[in-house]
């Protein structure tokens, strides 16, 4: 008997718990020849802003032991080009597309949420709060509970769609951030975004990345991500989406046990473009082999 793999995130029903992570899967179309999109639960777009962004100068990606650093700088086509050039593809796919977006003031976030709310092909919104608040001296929204709550509340007022908030791990207390976002109206929380790191070229005595620091992702961050998912899932009532170093079905299932309702696959897609599909299939096979009837029975089932 095939196990039941479907899960719910807010009002969003997913055929299985595996999504792709923002910034690692383009706008979906780029990977559609490598992945059967109808074998994964959902895909998340590159982060969108009101205006197009060229991103940071190169080099902006570097491989590290157990992962990679990126300082892409949120390069994207902007909301207008997204609507004109990227949305038509979304109509052709029977898999939920989640739009990730960011701004530099609460008003910018709200405007983007409102515009994305009006697009039927966008199934849900994911808010990237790992951006500086230009109105408050550059403090990163995702490192201050009050700032984060103000962004989430502004977005909540602008959309009826499922609102997911992606949390930064670069904080003292992730539970405090999670509870602030839940209180402001988040329907779900993505845990975690990248950790801040850097790489140095010894011979040149210079940073490898032109931006100096970047976001660390991949297997190196998995233990931190698991711990944070476990902490957050026990402290909030909304679903948690686990992210961080998921390279296999086993990795994904560990996040489910820790309390995640769904997972996102990111860096693995750079290694193997079909990673998300293979992980989803591997999870189903693991349950079937053990006679587990429903994935939901594993959510938060960690013992001890």
Curated annotation (Swiss-Prot):
Q: How is the cofactor bound?
A: Binds 1 FMN per subunit.
Q: What is this protein called?
A: Dihydroorotate dehydrogenase B (NAD(+)), catalytic subunit
Q: State the family it belongs to.
A: Belongs to the dihydroorotate dehydrogenase family. Type 1 subfamily.
Tell me what reaction this enzyme catalyses. (S)-dihydroorotate + NAD(+) = orotate + NADH + H(+)
Q: Which domain of life is it from?
A: Bacteria
**Which cofactors does this protein require?**
FMN
Task: Please tell me the species this chain comes from.
Answer: Trichlorobacter lovleyi (strain ATCC BAA-1151 / DSM 17278 / SZ) (Geobacter lovleyi)
Residues involved in FMN binding: 22, 46-47, 100, 128, 166, 192, 218, 244-245, 266-267
Q: Which residues bind substrate?
A: 46, 70-74, 128, 193-194
Entries under PROSITE patterns matching the protein: DHODEHASE_1, DHODEHASE_2
EC number from the UniProt entry: 1.3.1.14
Q: Name one GO cellular component term.
A: cytoplasm
Q: Please give the pathway this protein is involved in.
A: Pyrimidine metabolism; UMP biosynthesis via de novo pathway; orotate from (S)-dihydroorotate (NAD(+) route): step 1/1
Compartment(s): Cytoplasm
Protein role = Catalyzes the conversion of dihydroorotate to orotate with NAD(+) as electron acceptor.
Signal peptide span per the entry? none
Q: What does the record give under GO molecular function?
A: dihydroorotate dehydrogenase (NAD+) activity
Active site at: 131
**One of this protein's GO BP terms?**
'de novo' UMP biosynthetic process
For this UniProt record, the keywords arranged alphabetically read as follows: Cytoplasm, Flavoprotein, FMN, NAD, Oxidoreductase, Pyrimidine biosynthesis
Known partners and oligomeric status: Heterotetramer of 2 PyrK and 2 PyrD type B subunits.
């Amino acid at each position: 008997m095939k196990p039941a793999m479907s899960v719910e995130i807010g009002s969003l029903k997913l055929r299985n718990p595996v999504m792709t992570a923002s910034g690692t899967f383009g706008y979906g179309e780029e990977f559609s020849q490598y992945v059967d999109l109808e074998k994964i639960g959902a895909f998340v777009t590159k982060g969108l802003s009101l205006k197009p962004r060229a991103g940071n100068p190169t080099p902006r990606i570097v491989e590290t032991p157990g992962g990679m650093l990126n300082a892409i700088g949120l390069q994207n086509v902007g909301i207008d080009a997204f609507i004109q050039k990227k949305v038509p593809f979304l109509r052709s796919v029977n898999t939920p597309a989640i739009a990730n977006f960011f701004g530099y003031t609460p008003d910018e976030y709200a405007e983007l949420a409102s515009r994305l709310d009006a697009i039927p092909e966008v199934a849900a919104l994911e808010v990237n709060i790992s951006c500086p608040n230009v109105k408050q001296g550059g403090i990163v929204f995702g490192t201050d509970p009050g700032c984060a709550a103000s962004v989430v509340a502004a977005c909540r007022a602008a959309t009826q769609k499922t609102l997911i908030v992606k949390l930064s791990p670069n904080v003292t207390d992730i539970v405090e951030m999670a509870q602030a976002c839940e209180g402001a109206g988040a329907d779900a929380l993505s845990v975690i975004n990248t950790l801040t790191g850097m790489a140095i070229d010894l011979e040149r005595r210079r940073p490898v990345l032109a931006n100096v620091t970047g976001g660390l992702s991949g297997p190196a961050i998995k233990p931190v991500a698991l711990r944070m998912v476990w902490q957050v899932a026990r402290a909030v009532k909304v679903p948690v989406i686990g992210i961080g170093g998921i390279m296999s079905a086993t990795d994904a299932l560990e996040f489910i046990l820790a309390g995640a309702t769904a997972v996102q696959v990111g860096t693995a897609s750079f290694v193997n473009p079909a990673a998300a599909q293979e992980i989803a299939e591997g999870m189903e096979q693991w349950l079937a082999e053990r006679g587990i009837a429903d994935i939901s029975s594993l959510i938060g089932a960690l013992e001890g």
